[in-house]
Amino acid sequence: MPTIEVKSSNPYQVRIDKQLNTEIVTTAQLSGAENVAIITQPPLLERAGTLEKMLAQAGLASHVLAVPDAETGKTLEVAGRCWDQLGEWGFSRSDLIIGFGGGAATDLAGFVAAAWMRGIKVIQVPTTLLAMVDAAVGGKTGINTAAGKNLVGAFHEPIAVFIDVDHLDSLPQDEIIAGSAEIIKTGFIADPRILELYEKDPAACLLKDGHLPELIARSIAVKSKVVSQDLKESGLREILNYGHTFGHAVELRENFSWRHGNAVAVGMVFVAELANIRGLISDELVERHRKILKSIGLPTSYSQGHFEELHQGMKHDKKNRNSMIRFVALRDISDVVRLEGPTDEELFQAYSRLALEMS
């Protein structure tokens, strides 16, 4: 399986393979760290414990730090507890954190590492499909606040990312489906081959022994190319937020009870409809969004009667400038543009179209 190079001021590799613990330990040794903390989630304690024992056997002072599962772990309170623990363990600027888990764990681990002593090394070991193709690659870290998702954070690149596809065996099907939304996103913005694979055999796209490893690699290749050119989202990197403006508003309204990928799927349909209203894309391309997403069981509609709440959520999006709502939109496959300042009427019309299938 491939190794993907992320080229930046601090280049690093994304390793995609099976049984990668030995390589993780070797990388930790070569980092110069004496102390290593694995930040993980309760369901993964056994697997994290196996890695911790291997680190200890290699002569590293290793620790496991369990944080609350999912988005409930991405808070300032939880980050504070992590920093307190690092202090008790005597972590210095030369030490290392390993983020081991889903996207919430890797986001939190990266943020904790970015802030401790103004930045210590971090290795990311994503264990969910969503984290593999989205959260763990690119150096974005963050926590949530009452005002929105990931509004507090830092850009802090890992020294390595290890994607062990064996972790996919333990994931429920609905988690594989939700994570696939981020892969499909990269297909629309940069890699038509991804879309073709889903259209040809959607079932195989959900299988570790089918197309899924290739899709993971293709999606990461898209993201790594973008991140290599624009680490801090000053321009090009914004294209990775396709579907996220409305998606994040849905997550906020649902109090983060929706899976991120499901919200992004609906967000892609929303912005496709908005682009269609603006005359940027055809009815056929909007329908292609729906068909591909629905082919693997992702949602493409949203309940009505909540426009004002969602509108407020979109107003808090990080891409906005001067109080203007800005969307990443398409003119065609792999042809991405900014859609700025839509009217309330246009937004409401796009929102209303999300209910057409439900009526």
Swiss-Prot record:
Keywords tagged on the record: Amino-acid biosynthesis, Aromatic amino acid biosynthesis, Cobalt, Cytoplasm, Lyase, Metal-binding, NAD, Nucleotide-binding, Zinc
Enzyme Commission number(s) from the entry: 4.2.3.4
Major localisation: cytoplasm
Organism this protein belongs to: Corynebacterium diphtheriae (strain ATCC 700971 / NCTC 13129 / Biotype gravis)
InterPro entries: Dehydroquinate_synthase, DHQ_synth_AroB, DHQ_synth_fam, DHQS/DOIS_N, DHQS_C
Protein name per its UniProtKB record: 3-dehydroquinate synthase
Binding note for cofactor: Binds 1 divalent metal cation per subunit. Can use either Co(2+) or Zn(2+).
Sites where the protein binds Zn(2+): E182, H244, H260
Compartments it resides in: Cytoplasm
GO molecular function, one term: 3-dehydroquinate synthase activity
Family label: Belongs to the sugar phosphate cyclases superfamily. Dehydroquinate synthase family.
